[in-house]
Amino acid sequence: MKKKNFNKDTNKTPSFTGKDIYLYGKHPVSLALENKNRIVKEVLLLSSAQDKINIPKNIPFKFVSKEQLEAHVSKDAVHQGIIARCAPLPQLDTIDIIEESNKKEKDLVVILDQVTDPHNIGAIMRSAAAFNASAVIIPQNGAPDETGVLAKSASGALELIPLVKVKNLSRAMDELKEAGFWCIGLDGYAKRSIYETTLPKKAVIVMGSEGDGLRRLTSEKCDDTVKLPMNPKVESLNVSNACAVTLYEWNRQHLSGK
C-alpha cells in the first residue's frame, strides 16, 4: 500500500464532506493557498487588502464590498479583508497516520476525548503544529465541523497537520498502540508529575474535557497517566494550555536542540 503524506500530493482519492467552507484572515488563507490538499475555489477581497496576500494565478479572486464579504462570516470574525471559499479537506483515518509514523523513530499524536469547543480544538491544533505533532484525533460523534472559526483559532494549523475524526476512539487508541505508540493520559489525579516521567519516543497524548477530564474508560485504555504540577490555589488549566505544556515537555525530552 502506498504511504501517504498529508502535506504533499498523494494518490489517495480525496473524500470530501459537506459544503464549501469560508476561511478568513491573512494567515489561514495564505496557508490554505499553499496546501496542495486544499481546494481553494475563490478568494474574496476588500480592495484595501489586495497587497496583504499573494494569490496564485490559477486561483480566481474578486474584489467585493465589506457587506458582501461579511455575509459569509460571523459578525465578530477578524477577517482582515480576506476570505477564501474552499472545499473541506480530505478525510484521513488512523491508518494514514500510522503509515506515515512508520517512517519515523519518534512521533507525537494528540487525542482529544470530549473536547468539542472549536476554539479549544483550534488552539490545540496550533500547539500541535508548533510542537511537531503528526495529527490531532477526535471522536466523530460531537466533533465540530471544519469551519472558518476553527481554522482561525488554529491560525492555519489545519493546513499543516490533519484533524482526524474517528468513529471509535478506543479502537483508534488500540491501533496506535499496536503500531508502537504509548498512550499517555493527562489526569489531575495521576500519581506522578509529567516532569518525573520519561515520555515515550512514540507518544499519544490523551486529553479529556476541560470540565470532567478523562473519562474512566479512556483513562483505563491509557498505558500511563501523568499530571501537571501546579499551584494548589489554581484548580486547573484550560485544556488547550495544558496540552501545550505537555507537548512542549515531549519536545524538550526528545527534540531538544534539533
Segments (PLM) and residue ranges:
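Short, hinge-like loop/turn segments at secondary-structure boundaries
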Residues: H79-I82, K152-A157, P200-V204
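Active-site helix-initiating loop/hinge in glycosyltransferases
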Residues: G25, D113, N120, S236-N238
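RNA substrate-binding interface of SAM-dependent RNA methyltransferases
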Residues: L45, E99-R192
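Short acidic-hydrophobic, aromatic-tinged amphipathic segments that line or gate anion-handling sites
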Residues: L23, K62-K66, P162-S170, V226
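Active-site/ligand-binding-proximal alpha/beta "capping" segment
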Residues: I184-N238
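Structured adenosyl-cofactor binding patch, chiefly the S-adenosyl-L-methionine
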Residues: S30, N35, A129-A130, A151-S155, ...
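N-terminal positively charged helical leader segments and presequences
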Residues: M1-K103
